[in-house]
Amino acid sequence: MKRSDRYSNSNEHFEHMKHEPHYNTYYQPVGKPPKKKKSKRILLKILLTILIIIALFIGIMYFLSTRDNVDELRKIENKSSFVSADNVPEYVKGAFISMEDERFYNHHGFDLKGTTRALFSTISDRDVQGGSTITQQVVKNYFYDNDRSFTRKVKELFVAHRVEKQYNKNEILSFYLNNIYFGDNQYTLEGAANHYFGTTVNKNSTTMSHITVLQSAILASKVNAPSVYNINNMSENFTQRVSTNLEKMKQQNYINETQYQQAMSQLNR
């Protein structure tokens, strides 16, 4: 008797099929999800938590930065030795821009590359290292001079952006040149030029000799470590820094080849 005939009857066929093994190739085990999926969910929660913390931190820093009134920067103009950047020769301004912030005229308060480097240095060294724009230095010198914390660096970014929105570049440069320490209790560029060289940075002055290219480079190079670099007894490191500054000034067209060669000749005497 054929197998098909044996189970032609529906009841008999059903009874037989109950005892036949079933093979479901699409069977998925029921139970706990794989560990990989669980790990991914945990990782996503951690990342979300970190993002929320960062957002809260930035929000708090922004709120705290609004307490600093950028209108107060105008008080710098009341200094007796204040000279506006409009009245300073281009090569003098170039000496500081070349050394401190060569993209000064192109950014809006902070330079992403330099700032990122400074923030990582702050985290790793627990100290603030380089990378600040001139605008940021204006903010630091006026509002946060004695604060060297990581939170200061973040607040500085917000305030610098507000400064850029309220003032033009020459005004910002004026605030910088007239509120920075040059050593020997000198806090303005004009005061430093008078004190160290007996010259003036005011191109309209007729009572004093005008500051030279080399003198400009020396003062711009000194602000990095005003208490260390001695103008009257220049170290090899200081001399090299001035030389580098002069090279940058030439490369960025603040001085020509003749001015560069003359300044280098005076430096190497």
Swiss-Prot record:
Source organism of this protein record: Staphylococcus aureus (strain JH9)
Family matches, as PANTHER family: BINDING PROTEIN TRANSPEPTIDASE, PUTATIVE-RELATED (PTHR32282), PENICILLIN-BINDING PROTEIN 1B (PTHR32282:SF11)
Family as reported in the entry's similarity comment: Belongs to the glycosyltransferase 51 family.
Any one GO cellular component localisation term in the record: plasma membrane
Source domain of life: Bacteria
Encoding gene per record: mgt
Pathway: Cell wall biogenesis; peptidoglycan biosynthesis
GO BP: any one term: peptidoglycan biosynthetic process
Protein name as catalogued: Monofunctional glycosyltransferase
Keyword Transmembrane helix assigned: yes
